[in-house]
Amino acid sequence: MNVTNEKMRFWSPEVRELEPYVPGEQPKIQNLLKLNTNENPYPPSPKVKAAVETVLVDQADALRLYPDPDASLLKQAIAKQQHLSVEQVFVGNGSDEVLAHIFKAFFIQDEPILYPDISYSFYPVYSQFFGVQTKQIPLNDHFEIVVEDYQQNNGGIIIANPNAPTSIALSLKNIEQILKNNPDRVVVIDEAYVDFGAESAASLVNQYDNLVVCQTTSKSRSLAGLRVGYALAQAHLIAALEAVKNSFNSYPIDRFAIAAAVASFEDQAYFEEQCLKVIQSREQLIEQLETIGFDVLPSKANFIFVTHPAHVAIELAKALREQGIIVRHFNKPRINQYLRITVGTDEQNQRLVNTLKLFIN
């Protein structure tokens, strides 16, 4: 909505200057193949459906009551899955909310926080919103993080691993080096896509008192529609996040979301099966795209980042859209000739490849 300057007089000055995050579009197109927001192509575990039905049918009267503000059952399920204590788990209304609390709790410092110049575009939004100083660290020519670049004065560090939108993962060894180089600052590893082949830093939580790991149920557990994210850290860091949460919204997760997420964590076999299917489809898709001339960055996510030396990325995106296929293009320096493509089912990926062949050939 366009608001005139005259009507903006009611706005807080800070809000007038905000540059909000722009989410991937959710278009209403017939026979749409949606490969632009990294949603899982497979449904959640059948146990999730059963859990939601139980809340709706057997516990409907309880909907008049607020949900558990601590989401205790969910924290217990996450702690069990991650081999941590409940005191080392924080939950929120999607990992974006968890990240917002992280910025508020740890990053308002006298020195700038560090993050890659090409990364999740919510980081600069939160930085502006909370008045956090920032310094963007350029990825190298291969779009990789250079660990040594993060050995400088800072107010904290946040790294998406695997990185978005590049899909490239940082090794656990390199993450540990960043932690060791910054013992007096909080280092946040944002692991929205970690379950598709990268190494999680959750195994380092008990070793480093400056580490926060942020994860989500939206991608690998197919629960993007219910908004459940969480952080893993030592108890003293979790306490700061709880203080921020309870100063903002004491009941961030509803009964349906709690029940669904708990059920998801209780069905590990289904979770692993779906992740493997996405990984296998990703590798097959990469091979198919490389065959028709695309350059594809090495991916450990449920999406790939591709460019074609003979075709303009935005034109390819427009051509795909005309055929009912939506992918993500970022009109930003260094990556404006790339497309981010969510990995679909094998059938969906084949439709994508067949459509691209019409333009490439």
From Swiss-Prot:
Catalytically driven reaction(s):
L-histidinol phosphate + 2-oxoglutarate = 3-(imidazol-4-yl)-2-oxopropyl phosphate + L-glutamate
- Gene3D superfamilies named in the record: Aspartate Aminotransferase, domain 1, Type I PLP-dependent aspartate aminotransferase-like (Major domain)
This protein's pathway: Amino-acid biosynthesis; L-histidine biosynthesis; L-histidine from 5-phospho-alpha-D-ribose 1-diphosphate: step 7/9
Q: Which UniProt keywords apply?
A: Amino-acid biosynthesis, Aminotransferase, Histidine biosynthesis, Pyridoxal phosphate, Transferase
Residues carrying N6-(pyridoxal phosphate)lysine:
K219
Q: What is its EC number?
A: 2.6.1.9
Q: Which GO terms describe its biological process?
A: L-histidine biosynthetic process
User: A GO molecular function for this record?
Assistant: histidinol-phosphate transaminase activity
Q: Does the keyword Amino-acid biosynthesis apply?
A: yes
Say which enzyme class the record assigns: transferase
Where does this protein have coiled-coil stretches?
none
What the entry lists under CDD domains is as follows: AAT_like
Q: Which family does it belong to?
A: Belongs to the class-II pyridoxal-phosphate-dependent aminotransferase family. Histidinol-phosphate aminotransferase subfamily.
Q: How does it assemble?
A: Homodimer.
Q: In its UniProt entry, what is this protein called?
A: Histidinol-phosphate aminotransferase
Which organism does this sequence originate in?
Acinetobacter baylyi (strain ATCC 33305 / BD413 / ADP1)
Q: Which gene encodes it?
A: hisC
